[in-house]
Amino acid sequence: MFKRKSTAELAAQMAKLAGNKGGFSSEDKGEWKLKLDNAGNGQAVIRFLP
C-alpha cells in the first residue's frame, strides 16, 4: 500500500525529525493560566453560552 520512494529521502526526513529536540512550544500566548491570590487560592468563572 505505502511504498518508500527513496531511502535517502527517508533518512533526510528522520534526521530532520531527530533535530527537533524542543517538542511543543511551552510558551503559548492563547493558553489561559490561573492567577493565584496571596493565600494561594485561585478562582474561575464558568460561563455557559446560550
UniProtKB/Swiss-Prot annotation:
Record keywords: DNA damage, DNA recombination, DNA repair, DNA replication, DNA-binding, Metal-binding, Zinc, Zinc-finger
Sequence intervals crossing the membrane: none
InterPro entries: NA-bd_OB-fold (IPR012340), Phage_T4_Gp32_ssDNA-bd_sf (IPR044947)
Example GO biological process: DNA recombination
GO molecular function annotations of the record: DNA binding; zinc ion binding
Gene3D superfamilies: Replication Fork Single-Stranded Dna Binding Protein
Role played: Binds preferentially to single-stranded DNA and therefore, destabilizes double-stranded DNA. It is involved in DNA replication, repair and recombination. Binds ss-DNA as the replication fork advances and stimulates the replisome processivity and accuracy.
Subunit organization: Homodimer in the absence of DNA, monomer when binding DNA.
Additional remark text: Interacts with the polymerase and the uvsX and uvsY proteins.
Record-given protein name: Single-stranded DNA-binding protein
Organism of this sequence: Enterobacteria phage RB15
